[in-house]
């Protein structure tokens, strides 16, 4: 397929560009429906005139419906999106990026979606859809799924769909987190995933971070200890990777600690651990939930993070972080590979 695509790019460059644009529009309608032309144009950074012309063509082909509430994808349109996905990835060179990323970061599998989630919200949803698709095809009955907080995990929850085997699956927060925005808390995300997947959930009502005294007190609470054992024994772990200073400020970390993170060159954060460029742990937040060593016991660990700005943080984390699947976007993948080649 790669040779054919390269030939098409030489002979019909405009055709491939048009195909990619129409696929992107159709896929965006599928994600954001019902959506108006103006909203779609803003999402894709296209002019309304271009969107109107393409929408008219897609409507004539029976791929979308135009209603007073906005545009909706038809069943035929969904089939086209599904059938075109693999071809579009190959055409855009994403399959090559996936293989390079897999080798560079030493992960079992890498999935790269188009775009840059730093400035395109729909890209985060695409990463979320990729994560849900993988989960749907691999999850088994009676498995426990632990999920961290954050905007990327919230996008995964937004994309969640019913699972065939999920009626007996349990979703739990990977750690405490009361104090953050409610929509980005692990508790909220775990509950939403369970609701959409027809699964069950348990919540963990503890702040993050904790003082040493509070930590020991909470561990002695039977109810908290029970949920903690469930969390640390999770079969599947879904987590994001954050920029160290961004995460520290979001959690209202004391200025003294932030200065220490700067002095120690902290660049990434996951599960309350802060890592430098070499992947060494330079600071750890006292938190109730999954610890790094627990990842080696999980059957499947899925990391989801994207955006060109996160490339350094991602590279840092994967110096020692365990992951069976890494889902990212095109901008982050390219920046990671560029950084490794310097």
At which residue positions do the language-model features occur?
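HTH-adjacent hinge/linker in prokaryotic transcriptional regulators
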Residues: 59-141, 158, 163-166, 182
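Ligand-binding beta-strand-loop-alpha-helix segment within the catalytic cores
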Residues: 99-109, 167-243, 253
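Gly/Ser/Thr-rich loops at beta-strand to alpha-helix junctions
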Residues: 47-48, 146-155, 179, 243-245, ...
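Gly/Ser/Thr-rich active-site loops/lids in small-molecule metabolic enzymes
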Residues: 251-279
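Short Gly/Thr/Asp-enriched flexible loops that form oxyanion-binding sites at enzyme active sites
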Residues: 152-163, 249-257
């Amino acid at each position: 397929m790669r040779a054919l695509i390269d030939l098409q790019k030489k002979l019909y460059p405009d055709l491939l560009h048009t195909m990619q644009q129409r696929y992107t529009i159709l896929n965006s309608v599928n994600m954001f429906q019902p959506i108006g032309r103006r909203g779609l144009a803003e999402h894709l950074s296209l002019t309304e005139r271009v969107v109107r012309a393409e929408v008219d063509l897609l409507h004539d082909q029976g791929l979308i419906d135009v209603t007073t509430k906005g545009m909706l994808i038809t069943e035929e349109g969904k089939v086209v999106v599904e059938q075109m996905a693999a071809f579009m990835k190959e055409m855009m060179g994403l399959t090559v990026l996936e293989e390079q990323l897999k080798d560079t970061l030493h992960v079992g599998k890498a999935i790269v979606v188009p775009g840059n989630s730093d400035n395109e919200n729909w890209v985060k949803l695409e990463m979320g859809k990729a994560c849900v698709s993988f989960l749907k095809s691999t999850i088994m009955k009676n498995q426990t799924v632990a999920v961290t907080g954050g905007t990327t995990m919230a996008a995964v929850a937004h994309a969640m769909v019913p699972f065939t085997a999920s009626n007996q699956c349990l979703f739990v927060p990977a750690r405490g987190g009361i104090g953050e925005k409610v929509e980005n808390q692990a508790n909220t995300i775990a509950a939403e995933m369970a609701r959409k997947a027809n699964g069950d959930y348990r919540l963990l009502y503890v702040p993050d971070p904790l003082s040493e005294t509070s930590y020991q007190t909470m561990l002695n609470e039977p109810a908290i200890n029970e949920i903690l054992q469930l969390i640390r024994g999770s079969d599947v772990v879904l987590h994001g990777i954050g920029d160290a200073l961004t995460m520290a400020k979001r959690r209202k970390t004391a200025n003294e600690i932030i200065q220490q993170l700067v002095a120690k060159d902290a660049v990434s954060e996951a599960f309350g651990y802060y890592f430098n460029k070499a992947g060494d742990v330079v600071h750890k937040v006292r938190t109730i939930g999954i610890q790094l060593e627990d990842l080696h016991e999980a059957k499947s660990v899925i990391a989801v993070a994207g955006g060109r700005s996160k490339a350094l943080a991602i590279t840092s984390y994967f110096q020692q972080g365990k992951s069976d699947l890494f889902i990212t976007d095109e901008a982050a993948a390219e920046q990671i590979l560029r950084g490794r080649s310097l």
